[in-house]
Amino acid sequence: METKQERETGRSSPDPSPRKLIRRAATWEISDSDNEEETNKPQTESRKGPIVNIEATDQLLGVQKDPAQQPDVEEKTKNLVLPPPTSTTPSPTRRSRKKKTPEQVAAEQEQAEEKKRQRELKRQEKAQKKELEKIERERRKETNLALKLLRPDQCGKYMVVKVDAGLLEDAGSEDVLEALRVAEYNYSIEPHSVPQSISWRREMPADWTCIEGMDMKEEEEDQLLVLVEPKSYLSSVRTYAQAPYYFCVGNEMEEIPGSVFSIPAKNPHKKVTLVIIGLQEYRWCERLSRQIQRQSLDAAEGRDSNKDQSATRATRQQIQEALVFLQLHYNTEVLCLDTWKELGQHVCAVTKSIAQRPFRKHWEAQTFSFCTSAGSWRGWGPRGVLTGLPLTWRRQIQQLNRVSPAMAAVVSQAYPSPQLLMQAYSACGSDRERMSLLTDLRIPQDNNTGVTQKAEDPREVADIAQEGDQVPGRERRIGPDLSRRIWLLMTSKNPELVLDLNS
């Protein structure tokens, strides 16, 4: 009974304590029935929104509530839930993949293999390109090293002058050997098939690499120099004068004993040069001896002997005819010298020419050094200067004889390309007008000295033609000669035409 009364008094007490009214659980107790409800009603729980603690929210906002109403609020908040959202997005459905056919799988595999092959081919091409570039660099390096041995200042070291032992019988041969020693050329004394002759041989180092496109051979050169006595040469000329037609038939001249004309026929693979020392002196002495003989004899006997001697000696006309015959039929030159010293100088000059022959042929086959090659990244000078076609065109004009950089600059400024010059030629009415088209182009002069401007570097004469109108004083022109040569250069179809009449 007391317990019930105490409960009734506690409920009817007007001012109960807040601690007794609000009781908070330290922990949440979950019973077995809750689990059963969750399993039985999964959809209803998922639809319920999150539970909001209004009491904690009011405390944060500073709202004071009536303590008498707090138990009811607590009971309401336990079952209070947020309404479900009005717009719900449906969960994405998993896309079902279509099963590929075997043909599609095979096509995809083939496409993947094709891409793999393409990548492999590109990789191989790239590696091959690098290997070719490496080989090209090595080849250029070897070529440059080989060209160093063939430069004009180095090529003479590998030439050997072969002198026949019979040539040393004359006392003047010492002048020839002394000239070779002064020029620092190697020589050797060896017996030759042709007596009193000189030949040349090139001896390259063992580690020298042959350059592609260069005709190099480590053997005797095709030049042969033969020393001929004046008496033997004049005797051969008299024999030729007596039977000129007999000499022109094949190699019949080989049967004539003592004839120097048979030497070129016996050596067809050689470029033979006949050297005669003291021919004029010998003929003068021969003429003097005949005069002495005529004076010692009687008048009648002298006339008879004069007829006999005139029939046996060679005249100047016969000597000239023999020279023409040797030049035309055997491509043989005859060199008349006065002293052995001149012969030594000639041998040194021929040695130098033979030594430089491969180097000259190699550079003649190359393009101009001022042209930019296809694979080169460097131009001619920095940006902004004259490059490419204008520079090549200017240098081409400057290749002509007696053409200064200033003259070439004037022509290239008036007609910046060869095609423009050809169009100007086609616009002319006659050949005379075309020939004199460039005659009146003025060459500018220096303001201070009045001398025509000169420039070693074509970059320094880029604006020479533009300054010509402002230069006072006497002015030079291109002139008719250079105008005619340029016209012939651009229009002539004759490869053997000589442009410079003064050369």
UniProtKB/Swiss-Prot annotation:
Presence of keyword Thylakoid: no
Pfam family, one: EME1-MUS81_C
Keyword set includes Coiled coil: yes
Xref: InterPro entries: EME1/EME2_C, ERCC4_domain, Mms4/EME1/EME2, XPF_nuclease_EME2
CDD domains: XPF_nuclease_EME2
Segments forming a coiled coil: 103-151
UniProt-recorded Gene Ontology molecular function terms: DNA binding; endonuclease activity
One annotated Gene Ontology cellular component of this protein: Holliday junction resolvase complex
A GO biological-process term: DNA recombination
Keywords noted in UniProt: Coiled coil, DNA damage, DNA recombination, DNA repair, Nucleus
Ranges where the record places region Disordered: 1-135
Family membership noted in the UniProt record: Belongs to the EME1/MMS4 family.
Quaternary structure, from the entry: Part of the heterodimeric MUS81-EME2 complex; the complex forms specifically during the DNA replication phase of the cell cycle.
Function: Non-catalytic subunit of the structure-specific, heterodimeric DNA endonuclease MUS81-EME2 which is involved in the maintenance of genome stability. In the complex, EME2 is required for DNA cleavage, participating in DNA recognition and bending. MUS81-EME2 cleaves 3'-flaps and nicked Holliday junctions, and exhibit limited endonuclease activity with 5' flaps and nicked double-stranded DNAs. MUS81-EME2 which is active during the replication of DNA is more specifically involved in replication fork processing.
Protein name, as recorded: Structure-specific endonuclease subunit EME2
Protein source organism: Xenopus tropicalis (Western clawed frog)
